[in-house]
């Protein structure tokens, strides 16, 4: 089995392709179990965010077979995924996972949310019972590296995230947010960050819409906002100058018709909308309306690029930490190989012991002399344990394999 990281991200695939293979939280456990039951992977975890879908697994299968599984499971185009995917094996897979968890492979360099998403990916796989020793150890090494990157570099300073970029873009369109109302759809971590950034910029009013009023109230309370249900959005939409949405819905929440009605009530006063969700919460056709500025996560890239430079020096140090992490991972894997070898050796020797002891017990019950039995048992065990190594040594000697002979001496402490 070998560690594999296979997936697509914002660098390799458009939003249209990414949303086709995005997994909602409710889908993940079913997908994890389905993949393991397919026989393609012994251990598996799936990371699915707005910017990437990645499969991490211990597998003996070809990457192409897992790519076909992903396409079939999500009813996506295998040809599209073929052009957009990447596959990393072994040490390269570990390096990739470390870079992802540290924020070095994110749309926003150094963004902190990805580590939490990676930990959630690990937790879901653990709860689903599809993690084994190999993938567990890989994740632990990944988390240790990401923690070092956060604590030993400035990669997380000067907050830059999709949420920050969305608010920065809003400021470019509405220079003063103190007179504006923002409608936030969702109540997750990204929306919480958006709310915090908007509050820091002095937004006049915040409205939080969510599928459950309880979650909306929890966020609204923290930011002195108004909490509403998703069903109430049409009523409140005309009051919103800014709409930012990030939910896990599999279907759009805002259509062109609903926005047209809101614009009429606003007397066509412009609306700024950012759809951070994958799949999208806002129908793309909404962007065709003359008085709407609609942006997606891909549109935020330009804003984000301007803020990358301050983190690039820190990223160099982070890559050095990742190099060290990969070396430690290699040592972990070698140690794990030794553990498996010792386990197999012990099972083999215990099987021989059990067989010989059973023979001795049978002879004892038949009235054999105990002292003679002990001598016979010890002789048989010695011969059985010596047979395979002795045969291998004779063969190595006849073939001139001196290094194996020297290794044998070292292994058994023979001078």
From Swiss-Prot:
Its name, as the record gives it, is Glutamyl-tRNA reductase
Task: Say if the entry is tagged with keyword Oxidoreductase.
Answer: yes
Q: Which GO terms describe its biological process?
A: protoporphyrinogen IX biosynthetic process from glutamate
Electron transport: present as a keyword of the record? no
Q: Which InterPro entries would you find in this protein's record?
A: 4pyrrol_synth_GluRdtase (IPR000343), 4pyrrol_synth_GluRdtase_dimer (IPR015896), 4pyrrol_synth_GluRdtase_N (IPR015895), GluRdtase_CS (IPR018214), GluRdtase_dimer_dom_sf (IPR036453), GluRdtase_N_sf (IPR036343), NAD(P)-bd_dom_sf (IPR036291), Shikm_DH/Glu-tRNA_Rdtase (IPR006151)
Query: Which species is the source of this protein?
Result: Teredinibacter turnerae (strain ATCC 39867 / T7901)
Q: What is known of its domains?
A: Possesses an unusual extended V-shaped dimeric structure with each monomer consisting of three distinct domains arranged along a curved 'spinal' alpha-helix. The N-terminal catalytic domain specifically recognizes the glutamate moiety of the substrate. The second domain is the NADPH-binding domain, and the third C-terminal domain is responsible for dimerization.
The gene that this protein is the product of is hemA
The pathway to which it is assigned is: Porphyrin-containing compound metabolism; protoporphyrin-IX biosynthesis; 5-aminolevulinate from L-glutamyl-tRNA(Glu): step 1/2
What protein family is recorded?
Belongs to the glutamyl-tRNA reductase family.
- Coiled-coil annotated spans: none
| Pfam families registered for this protein in UniProt | GlutR_dimer, GlutR_N, Shikimate_DH
In short, the EC number is: 1.2.1.70
Reaction(s) this enzyme catalyzes, per UniProt: (S)-4-amino-5-oxopentanoate + tRNA(Glu) + NADP(+) = L-glutamyl-tRNA(Glu) + NADPH + H(+)
Role summary: Catalyzes the NADPH-dependent reduction of glutamyl-tRNA(Glu) to glutamate 1-semialdehyde (GSA).
Task: Site Important for activity: give positions.
Answer: 96
């Amino acid at each position: 089995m070998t560690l594999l990281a296979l997936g697509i991200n914002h660098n390799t695939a458009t939003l249209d392709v990414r949303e086709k293979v995005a997994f909602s939280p409710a889908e993940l456990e079913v997908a994890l179990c389905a993949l393991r039951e397919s026989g393609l992977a012994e251990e598996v975890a799936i990371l699915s965010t707005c910017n990437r879908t990645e499969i991490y697994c211990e597998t003996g299968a070809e990457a192409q077979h897992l790519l076909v599984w992903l396409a079939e499971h999500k009813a996506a185009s295998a040809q599209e995924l073929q052009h957009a995917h990447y596959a990393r094996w072994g040490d390269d897979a570990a390096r990739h996972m470390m870079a992802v968890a540290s924020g070095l492979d994110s749309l926003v360099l150094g963004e902190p949310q990805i580590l939490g998403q990676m930990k959630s990916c690990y937790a879901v796989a653990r709860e689903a019972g599809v993690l084994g020793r190999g993938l567990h150890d890989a994740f632990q090494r990944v988390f240790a590296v990401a923690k070092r990157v956060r604590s030993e570099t400035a990669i997380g300073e000067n907050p830059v995230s999709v949420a920050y970029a969305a608010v920065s873009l809003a400021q470019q369109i509405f220079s003063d947010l103190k007179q504006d109302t923002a409608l936030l759809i969702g109540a997750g971590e990204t929306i919480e960050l958006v709310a915090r950034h908007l509050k820091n910029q002095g937004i006049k009013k915040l409205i939080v819409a969510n599928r459950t009023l309880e979650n909306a109230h929890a966020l609204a309370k923290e930011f002195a906002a108004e909490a509403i249900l998703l069903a109430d959005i049409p009523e409140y939409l005309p009051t919103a100058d800014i709409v930012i949405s990030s939910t896990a819905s599999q279907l759009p929440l805002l259509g062109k018709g609903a926005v047209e009605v809101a614009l009429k009530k606003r007397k066509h006063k412009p609306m700024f909308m950012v759809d951070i969700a994958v799949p999208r919460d806002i129908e793309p056709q909404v962007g065709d309306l003359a008085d709407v500025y609609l942006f997606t996560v891909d549109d935020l890239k330009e804003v984000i690029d301007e803020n990358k430079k301050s983190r690039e020096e820190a990223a160099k140090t982070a890559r050095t930490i990742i190099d060290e992490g990969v070396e430690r991972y290699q040592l972990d894997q070698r140690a794990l190989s030794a553990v498996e070898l010792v386990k197999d050796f012990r099972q083999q020797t215990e099987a021989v012991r059990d067989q010989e002891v059973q023979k001795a017990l049978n002879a004892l019950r038949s009235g054999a002399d105990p002292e003679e039995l002990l001598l016979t048992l010890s002789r048989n065990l010695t011969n059985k344990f010596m047979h395979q190594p002795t045969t291998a040594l004779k063969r190595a000697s006849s073939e001139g394999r001196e290094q194996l002979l020297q290794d044998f001496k070292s292994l058994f402490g023979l001078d």
